[in-house]
Every structure is written in structure tokens, then in C-alpha cells.
Amino acid sequence: MSLDVDGALERVLSGGDEWRAWRALRLGGDDAGAMPRIPGQDRVGGFAGPTGRPSPGATGLALCHLELISAAGAPAAIIAADWLEAMRTPAHAWLDAPDDVPGVIDDRGAGRVWATAATTCALLAARRDPGPRAFALLRGEVDQEGHVTGGTYPTFALAGAAWLAEGPGTETAEWALRWTREWAEEWWGPQERATALTFWAAAGIPPEHPSVDEFLEELRSEAPQEGWTDLDLTLLALELVAHFD
């Protein structure tokens, strides 16, 4: 990894907010104290998506991130999981507006698939039950290559959800993970790889899996020595490397 870990942590501590500083101190092995309030989370547990509205997909991703940094037992994680359970639709799925789906979407149903995949992965990682209908819905959205209706980000989340729902090495999980290796899009960058790795870390996919190994190596090679101008991306990359190493 070309990233200077100590230098990047110092940048976060000097330029980041309280939440980033808390994470940086923990990564550096220092006493970080109590977890501060997480930016973007409302008082009932939901996290804001790209539009600023509370989003099941964004909340699922945030809950997976808390699992990644070993904070799944924190109050912020507990109320996020509670909020997700409360947001289940009558069809036992979850729903986001298309504008709240990250990346390039390829289907009008992307909001439903993204929200359901991210939430299913997060709830299973948090030892909660998303219900059998949620994963049955997701399985019906997977094509013969392993791609999921809605695009890249729903496929990343589905891979983690399938690993947890069906077990390691099962067909749905491996199809989705293979798709991420064999059908990579030109527009994918460090943000896409870091997001995928967050879902996969929460799901417990091991570092030796070919998809994890490839994405982690690409993330390492893309990192500037001083880190990205996006402090959140820099900090997340450091957390992912620490987790998988």
C-alpha cells in the first residue's frame, strides 16, 4: 500500500470531525473514549442517502461499516438495526428512491433491490432476521452472470447477503462475487471497491477469497501516499486494510 498510514491518520485527526477523529484514534491504537454521534444518522436510527432523506440502503451500508470497525454493539448500531426492521414494507422488502441508489443504475427497480440487498446483508451481520422473503426476492433478481437488477452497488451488497444467508461458497454468493471480478466497469474506482469490501467484511468473507484479494489489492495500488482528498475514503481504506490484514 502506497498510503502513508501515520501521515494519513494525522491528516484525519487535524482536518476531520469528531467521528473521524474517534475512528483514527482507534486505528492508531489510542484510547478514543466514547463513540461520538455519527454524522448523517437521525435520532431514530436512519442514515441519510444521497438525497438527504433517511435511506434503508445507506443505513444498511452504515450498519455494515459499524460491523467492520467492531462497533456493532454500540447504541448507534442498535437503533440503526431497529430502524431497518421498522422500515420493512408489507412485501417484506425495503425500498429506496432511485436517486438514493449509489453508482450507475440500470433498472427502474434499482431502489427496491439496493435497499433490500444492503439491509439484508446488514441485518444478518447484526444477527437479526430479515425474513425469508427478502432473500427470496433478491435471488429472483440475479441473472446468469451473477449481476443483480439495479447495477453495481446492489450486486456488491447481494454478494454479502448471500454469503450470510446461504453460507460460504454457495452458488448465489459465488456468482455475484465472480461477476465483480469478470464484469468490472470502467467507472469503478476506490469508492466502489471500498463499498464492496465493507459489505464483504461485514459478511465475514475471508481475505483469501479471489474477489476480496483483487479489490483490496486494487484499493491499495490506487491510494496516494498522502491519502485521498476525501478523508472518509482515506479512513475507510485504512479500516479495511486493518480488518483484512
Model region roles, listed by residue range:
Residues 1-245:
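Preference for long, amphipathic alpha-helical scaffolds in soluble/luminal domains
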